[in-house]
């Protein structure tokens, strides 16, 4: 048997049909350099029942240490409230193939545009996804002589791709540790207000986190 740890990347079939796989290929290459095996699965949608069931079956066979999800929005079923990505109980990282160009991202004070924030950050967080970060931006190619228009494809950002690999590796190391070896920090917000209201609404939140004797 192959003793190498395995990660699974899930992405849209449309990327394959459009030969727009540069960010996926880059992740494969980066994982290989870290001696991590990589398997990819392409889908039309994670919400199709037959697809979701097949995904669960495949993930059980693959037994990945982590899943990288490049599909957008929520993957939870309306009927069950469950996502096929949660079937094997490993961290699921939401990776972002941005719909905007790098220049737009740099100029935007909040980085991603509103569509990307909704599709790849806010809604996936409701599913319990871990934000993996951006792996690529849209980039127009030269005008295709046959089609007579510039084809827009995803251009990988290698520095950001490596950050995703680092994050996956660190989560794997963390999961391998015993609970008593872990140190957890809980960061609570304290919105502006009067001094006597400082942290008032959070006063009981810390109680359940205290160790029991």
Language model regions located:
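Flexible inter-domain linker/hinge segments
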Residues: 1-6, 84-86, 92-94, 99-185, ...
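Single conserved hydrophobic/aromatic residue that forms the stacking wall/gate
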Residues: 203-213
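Proline-aspartate-enriched helix->loop->beta-strand connector
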Residues: 63-67
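Flexible loop/turn segments at secondary-structure boundaries
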Residues: 15-18, 46-49, 74-77, 100-104, ...
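A short, flexible N-terminal coil/short beta segment enriched in small residues
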Residues: 1-25, 32-33, 192-194
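Metallocofactor- and cofactor-centric catalytic cores in central/energy metabolism, strongly enriched
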Residues: 17, 33, 37-59, 177-185
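Internal alpha/beta domain cores that form substrate/cofactor-binding pockets in large enzymes
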Residues: 39-42, 47, 55-62, 76-96
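Short helix-loop-beta junction
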Residues: 25-39, 206
């Amino acid at each position: 048997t192959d003793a190498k740890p395995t990660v699974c990347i899930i992405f849209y079939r449309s990327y394959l049909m459009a030969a727009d796989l540069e960010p996926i290929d880059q992740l494969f290459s980066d994982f290989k350099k870290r001696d991590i095996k990589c398997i990819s699965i392409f889908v039309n949608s994670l919400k199709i029942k037959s697809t979701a069931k097949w995904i669960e079956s495949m993930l059980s066979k693959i037994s990945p240490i982590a899943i990288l999800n490049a599909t957008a929005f929520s993957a939870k079923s309306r009927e069950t409230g469950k996502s096929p990505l949660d079937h094997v109980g490993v961290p699921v990282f939401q990776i972002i193939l941005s719909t905007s160009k790098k220049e737009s991202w740099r100029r935007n004070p909040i980085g991603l545009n509103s569509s990307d924030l909704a599709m790849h950050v806010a809604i996936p967080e409701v599913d319990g996804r871990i934000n993996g970060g951006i792996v690529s931006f849209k980039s127009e190619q030269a005008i295709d002589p046959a089609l007579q228009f510039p084809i827009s494809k995803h251009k990988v950002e290698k520095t950001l791709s490596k950050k995703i690999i680092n994050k996956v590796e660190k989560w794997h190391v963390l999961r391998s540790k015993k609970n008593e070896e872990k140190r957890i920090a809980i960061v609570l917000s304290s919105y502006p207000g009067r001094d006597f209201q400082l942290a008032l609404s959070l006063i009981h939140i810390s109680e359940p986190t205290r160790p029991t004797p």
